[in-house]
């Protein structure tokens, strides 16, 4: 989709015309399969490296267009958020030192990006979800200023006719309504591509589904969103809900989310997979660059199947089927979309090597996996891995097994054999599979981040802890040590962080509030139980309407505790915005001689600064 000028499908005529070309693309693909035109070998690999742009104090930067212009390299492109960019690697033949060559290529490109970013007071970071993200960064003003992103945002919003409802429950809980698809921009991935022989495509696709849970478990690197500890790989939950075009869970024409693992094992041919997608998910976009693929094929040329690729670009399976043309030859690929970016480039390449090795190493025991494993087990394994990472218990071939045992005893040996049989350099196999093996025995990205985050909070605020985490990851992302060798942080501070602390960064977040209708007796006991002296008062709209203090209760006396909060609260309040500086907050408190300063945003009570 990124290469096409797209527009939203609106009129019945536009939809009919686009569908006409879409059906022709399917027929052309069938014809190419029948005539054995799809390339079978050599096999190629490739990757899409998404990364974040951060300011000098490690907050999201809005300078993607400026940085992209300075980079001036065709390998780079935009993402939906202004604080993200993407690198598309060159395709490489699957042989010898291809993985270390990819490592070097991405290292050079990321170094180029870092240098260009620095000229705009910006840094680059590879991580699954940027720890310093705040709610304001997912507003529409952070959408990258390119027409296709506004068109996609509009199309997805129109297909829902209501706000996106995000609810994720982990150790903490996140629940919010959002009016755009910008939550998608929270996710940063390392998407890996493997060319597949068309004769074995469906069986290979089902195998890719079967191994998704275990591969994800060892790769998890995104446990935090807006400071909350959610899933080991929170990207899975965020992306599933942020692109969901269903208005609720009961929809007749789309029982799956556009972001999904699937509903069953695939059967038939690769064209049947595309047919299923088209049957389930209505087209959202069209382009003026349509072509009659059958006519092109009849001329002896190879069509690009533009209509099909455009539709496929709005269906986000975690294992996505891809069609492409390279060197005048059509080919099929599986795109693995669930692997996160980071925490180091070496970790990312190791993740890819593990996945490719497993895909290549599929033994006779696992051929036709659809007849040997229940699909619900594969799907359940995937989402359990997203929640719990390496702490997952998998159901593998009808047996329960720990993630560690499954990796060390079964999957790592399969992957090594697959790589050896493909002629991959022995040193590369030892290096990258050694990283996976060491990570299984120690820590992966999400485990390191959670342990470090908890340790840092013993001395620092949640905001400072997230900032220091981000600073450390930036400093070490291209180092020789992979995450399995990182020490968990307990006290870390970079002197080059240029902090301009605001109220949002230091305000108390774990607060008790009372309603106007609550009794003063309840308020009195809450204050005694929790040893607090101030309680914000809110109405049913969550708007701050008053403040009740222990001094107020003393003045009233016990006889009046039967009355409501509304009858006794202070209503002439001094408040502050969460975006104001800490110096301003301190100044206000000193001037008015107060010990509690409520923080509000658009009349809604947020928290309190003491």
Where are each of the predicted segments found?
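Phosphate/nucleotide-binding catalytic core
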Residues: 1-497
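Bateman (tandem CBS) regulatory domains
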Residues: 498-511, 562-573
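Short beta-to-alpha loop/turn elements within the nucleotide-binding domains of ABC transporters
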Residues: 501, 518, 548, 563, ...
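Glycine-rich, positively charged N-terminal anion/phosphate-binding segment
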Residues: 490-500, 550-561
């Amino acid at each position: 989709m990124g290469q096409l000028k797209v527009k939203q499908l609106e009129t019945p005529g536009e939809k009919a015309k686009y569908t006409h070309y879409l059906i022709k693309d399917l027929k052309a693909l069938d014809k190419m399969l029948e005539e054995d035109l799809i390339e079978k070998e050599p096999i190629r690999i490739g990757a899409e490296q998404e990364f974040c742009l951060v300011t000098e104090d490690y907050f999201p930067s809005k300078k993607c267009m400026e940085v992209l212009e300075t980079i001036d390299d065709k390998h780079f492109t935009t993402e939906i958020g202004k604080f993200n960019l993407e690198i598309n690697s060159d395709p490489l033949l699957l042989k010898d030192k291809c993985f270390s060559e990819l490592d070097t290529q991405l290292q050079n490109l990321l170094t180029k990006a870092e240098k260009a970013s620095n000229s705009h007071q910006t840094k680059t970071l590879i991580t699954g979800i940027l720890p310093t993200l705040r709610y304001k960064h997912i507003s529409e003003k952070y959408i990258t200023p390119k027409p296709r992103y506004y068109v996609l945002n509009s199309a997805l919003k129109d297909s829902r006719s209501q706000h996106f409802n995000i609810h994720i429950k982990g150790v903490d809980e996140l629940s919010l309504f959002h009016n755009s698809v910008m939550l998608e921009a929270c996710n940063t991935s390392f998407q890996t591509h493997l060319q597949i022989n068309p004769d074995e495509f469906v069986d290979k696709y089902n195998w890719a589904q079967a191994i998704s849970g275990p591969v994800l478990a060892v790769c998890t690197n995104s446990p935090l969103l807006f400071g909350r500890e959610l899933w080991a790989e929170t990207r899975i939950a965020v992306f599933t809900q942020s692109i969901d075009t269903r208005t609720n869970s009961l929809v007749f024409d789309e029982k799956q989310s556009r972001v999904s693992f699937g509903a069953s094992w695939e059967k038939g041919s690769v064209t049947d997979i595309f047919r299923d997608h088209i049957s389930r998910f209505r087209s959202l976009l069209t382009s003026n660059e349509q072509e009659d693929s059958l006519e092109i094929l009849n001329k002896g040329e190879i069509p690009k199947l533009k209509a099909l690729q455009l539709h496929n670009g709005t269906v986000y399976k975690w294992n996505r089927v891809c069609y492409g043309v390279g060197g005048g030859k059509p080919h099929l690929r599986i795109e693995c979309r669930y692997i996160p970016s980071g925490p180091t480039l070496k970790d990312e390449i190791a993740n890819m090597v593990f996945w490719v090795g497993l895909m290549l190493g599929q033994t006779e025991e696992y051929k036709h996996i659809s007849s040997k494993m229940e699909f619900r087990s594969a799907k359940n394994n995937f989402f359990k891995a997203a929640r719990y990472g390496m702490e997952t218990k998998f159901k593998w071939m009808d047996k329960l097994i720990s993630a560690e045992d499954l990796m060390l005893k079964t999957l790592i040996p399969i992957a090594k054999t697959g790589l050896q049989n493909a002629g991959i350099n022995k040193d590369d196999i030892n290096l990258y599979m050694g990283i996976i093996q060491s990570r299984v025995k120690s820590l992966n990205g999400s485990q390191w981040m959670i342990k470090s985050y908890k340790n840092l909070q013993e001395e620092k605020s949640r905001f400072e802890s997230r900032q220091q985490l981000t600073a450390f990851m930036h400093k070490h992302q291209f180092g020789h040590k992979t995450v399995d060798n990182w020490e968990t942080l307990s006290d870390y501070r970079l002197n080059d962080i240029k902090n301009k602390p605001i109220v949002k960064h230091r305000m108390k977040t774990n607060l008790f509030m009372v309603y106007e209708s609550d009794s003063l007796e309840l308020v009195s006991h809450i204050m005694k139980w929790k040893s607090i002296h101030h309680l914000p008062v809110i109405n049913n709209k969550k708007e701050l309407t008053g403040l009740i203090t222990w001094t107020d209760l003393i003045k009233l006396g016990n006889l009046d505790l039967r009355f409501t909060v509304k009858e006794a609260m202070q209503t002439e309040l001094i408040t502050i915005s969460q975006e104001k500086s800490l110096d301003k907050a301190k100044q206000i408190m000193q001037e008015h001689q107060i010990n509690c300063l409520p923080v509000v945003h658009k009349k809604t009570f947020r928290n309190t600064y003491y």
